[in-house]
Amino acid sequence: SEDGENPNVDDLEVGVFPVHYDDLKLELAWTIVPFMLIVYLTYISWAPLDNIWSSPNGGSFGDECDYFNNESSDLYFDEDDGLKGAYKANCYHTIEITAKQWVWSFDCGTLEAELCESGFTEADGRAVPHLSLQAGNAYLAYMTSEDVTHAPWFVSLGVKEDVLPGQTTTVWILAEDVEDFLLLCTEYCGDDHAYMMAGVTIHA
């Protein structure tokens, strides 16, 4: 106004909520719709998450394979398990993965070379550790770190799990398809973090 006073164009009253700006239907919609979406996403992810975090004692992948009888995992996909199906195996093999700045090391234990073999390969013009596994088998990797926190990411398999100094963590490696891919560290672990990689081969 001309005398410098601002008129109360919205007819607001001190201490009174402006009800004419309220929209109950809209508020219910933006509360209920995201809630239902979260419930749906939880439902469709439950089976694969339960599968990849399966117990090593009689879970989806049975018990540890009998090495003396050269037992195979016989990994297969059960379409009738859960909404989207799940991987299962008669048994599994165990391996060990150790991380330290800035290299991975693999221990196949008593497994035959056909089931698991470690060595070196070339990636980005450098010699890097290499792990070779046999397709059609399930592996349970026991992992630890000798120094700082690392996070091995099996790129093609889409699995990742942190490894911590002084602790042992596990991850299931389901070797289904014949392929080659990288194992990368996805937790910053120092100056050469970007070069901490290994080659992984799944062979027939």
Residue ranges and their predicted role:
Residues 2-204:
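Non-transmembrane, membrane-proximal soluble domains of secreted or membrane proteins
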